Amino acid sequence: MDSLDPRNRPVRKVFTTRAGGVSQSPYASFNLGDHVGDDPQAVASNRNRLADIIGLSPDKVVYMEQIHSNTVTVIDEAPADGQAVEATDALVTTQRGLALAVLVADCVPVLLSDTDAGVIAAVHAGRMGARNGIVAKTIAKMEELGAKPSRIHALMGAAASGANYEVPEAMARDVEAKLPGSIARTTKGTTGLDIRAGLLRQMLSLGVQMIDSDPRCTIEDEDLFSYRREGTTGRQAGVVWLPKEA
């Protein structure tokens, strides 16, 4: 077995960009969100393409009905009807071969794994969810299933950066009070938020030491979807799964 082959790694984590799909403007082209007004057939084609690329059946990639909550849902199987898991912003599983997907266009996608315990999670950490503890709650749920913070690896995807995510000062201070380290100053000199910075501090305080982050800013990087930059637009995905044992 080639230990350097990514197909042999104990956990797989991927992020998509806006390239490589069939959706038309303003969703061009690899939009994976079925709730943004895109042609459903185009979204289905893109989702099938993603599943094919990562080597899984489309019905083994589980999406969420994301509502900017702090609700965490443990699943043992994909919904029988192929629909998204209702009203949740984090999925946790111990099932091999079941991929968990999070959709974003500025919010922070967080992929978590403890391969020793065989527990993974995908988290949609938007401003409100992050403020209200969605990541901490997900880690706690993983611990209930045998994970340990010291063994958890966290990967945060591209998201709105503090340099560009401008918000009213009262909003920033409200988030800072619940998620210390998130208040920022934009390149314009105005008050902003850096949710990834706040989540980094929070995860470190919880004992998670292995943390990586895609540094790209969705607002400024045109290879990525951004609601802040574009308004009506698509969604990219973060996906995590435990491969089935050979």
Swiss-Prot record:
It catalyses: adenosine + phosphate = alpha-D-ribose 1-phosphate + adenine; S-methyl-5'-thioadenosine + phosphate = 5-(methylsulfanyl)-alpha-D-ribose 1-phosphate + adenine; inosine + phosphate = alpha-D-ribose 1-phosphate + hypoxanthine; adenosine + H2O + H(+) = inosine + NH4(+). GO terms for molecular function: adenosine deaminase activity; copper ion binding; oxidoreductase activity; S-methyl-5-thioadenosine phosphorylase activity. Keywords: Copper, Hydrolase, Metal-binding, Oxidoreductase, Transferase, Zinc. Signal peptide: none annotated. Its cofactor is Cu(2+); Zn(2+). Its EC number is 2.4.2.1, 3.5.4.4, 2.4.2.28. It holds the Pfam family Cu-oxidase_4. The keyword Hydrolase applies. Homodimer. Purine nucleoside enzyme that catalyzes the phosphorolysis of adenosine and inosine nucleosides, yielding D-ribose 1-phosphate and the respective free bases, adenine and hypoxanthine. Also catalyzes the phosphorolysis of S-methyl-5'-thioadenosine into adenine and S-methyl-5-thio-alpha-D-ribose 1-phosphate. Also has adenosine deaminase activity. Belongs to the purine nucleoside phosphorylase YfiH/LACC1 family. This is Purine nucleoside phosphorylase Cgl2154/cg2365.
